[in-house]
């Protein structure tokens, strides 16, 4: 499975442009499991007798906002796993239950953040605030009195406070520096179409990791762009350097409509990647798995 993230989403909070609830792919948070026990937080008992557990209503909200301000002072000492823990709970407070689709297959870091948020399920905002505050207190037992002085001085970005947010700002790509893969990622159908029709770009051109435009379009969920590429004879079964086809990407990202589009266009669901995984084995969607099996089953 790909563990790189060559693309990143532009939203400063969590990615995907104007969508404030999709994790982006800024500076990596680190590897390992997404479970809290593996975030270096086992010593943080969020149900213990922390002062925040006794707070309610406005008092708890004020303590939470204060803790969010204090995070800026902890960036150099907290691990990326701990920042991820805080990120998930901040999102739970500000947005609620994870309500976005899984990030793109290339977007490894975004998937980690998305998974951390999603695993909180129906956790209440109150519990998320308490756990957030408890974690910050554990990281900074003495507390930071400076936070109250500067609260309101900076606009909060919605990514766990200004400090956490600053780690994930996407570097803006100047127009003159963009390549065809950037336009594909942006779903700039007009530009991609002109580049292909004018022969400026081969529809099957690959990036440094062997990913074709079709891989990128499927990864980002751009159905219309996928259709355009197929109409221009994109190699539907092209494999990247890890042996993954566009069908692997669409399946892993759980874009059911694109999976169906690819299958109807002749994509081969029996192709395995270098790890021996079929497209149906890289998705968590039972509906997509079922669809893939229908096309894999011998006809007779």
From Swiss-Prot:
Keyword Cytoplasm in record: yes
Question: Could you say which residues bind an acyl-CoA here?
Answer: 87-91, 113, 132
- For the region Disordered, what residue ranges are annotated? 1-43, 142-162, 270-300
- Care to name a GO molecular-function term for this sequence? fatty-acyl-CoA binding
UniProt xrefs under PROSITE patterns: ACB_2, ANK_REP_REGION, ANK_REPEAT
* Residue spans of biased composition, Polar residues class: 284-293
Role, per record: Binds long-chain acyl-coenzyme A molecules with a strong preference for unsaturated C18:1-CoA. Does not bind fatty acids. Plays a role in protein N-myristoylation.
Name of the protein in question? Acyl-CoA-binding domain-containing protein 6
């Amino acid at each position: 499975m790909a563990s790189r993230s060559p693309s990143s989403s532009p939203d400063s909070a969590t990615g995907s442009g104007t969508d404030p609830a999709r994790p982006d792919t800024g500076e990596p948070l680190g590897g390992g499991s997404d479970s809290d026990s593996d975030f270096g937080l086992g010593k943080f008992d969020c149900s213990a007798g922390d002062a925040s557990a006794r707070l309610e209503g406005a008092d708890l909200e004020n303590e939470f906002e204060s803790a969010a301000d204090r995070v800026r002072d902890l960036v150099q000492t907290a691990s990326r796993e701990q920042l991820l823990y805080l990120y998930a709970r901040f999102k739970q407070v500000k947005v609620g239950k994870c309500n976005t689709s899984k990030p793109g297959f290339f977007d490894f870091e975004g998937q980690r953040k998305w998974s951390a948020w999603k695993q909180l399920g129906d956790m209440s905002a109150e519990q998320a605030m308490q756990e957030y505050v408890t974690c910050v207190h554990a990281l900074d037992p003495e507390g930071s009195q400076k936070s109250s002085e500067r609260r309101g001085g900076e606009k909060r970005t919605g990514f766990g406070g200004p400090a956490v947010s600053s780690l994930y700002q996407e570097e803006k790509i100047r127009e003159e520096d963009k390549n065809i893969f950037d336009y594909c990622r942006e779903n700039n159908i007009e530009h991609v179409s002109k580049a292909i029709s004018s022969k400026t770009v081969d529809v099957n051109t690959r990036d440094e990791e062997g990913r074709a435009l079709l891989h990128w379009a499927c990864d980002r969920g751009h159905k219309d762009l996928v259709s355009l590429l197929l109409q221009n004879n994109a190699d539907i079964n092209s494999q990247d350097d890890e042996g993954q086809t566009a069908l692997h990407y669409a399946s892993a990202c759980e874009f059911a409509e694109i999976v169906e589009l690819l299958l109807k266009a002749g994509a081969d669901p029996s192709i395995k990647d270098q790890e021996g995984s079929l497209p149906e084995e890289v998705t968590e969607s039972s509906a997509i798995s079922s669809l893939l099996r229908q096309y894999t089953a011998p006809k007779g």
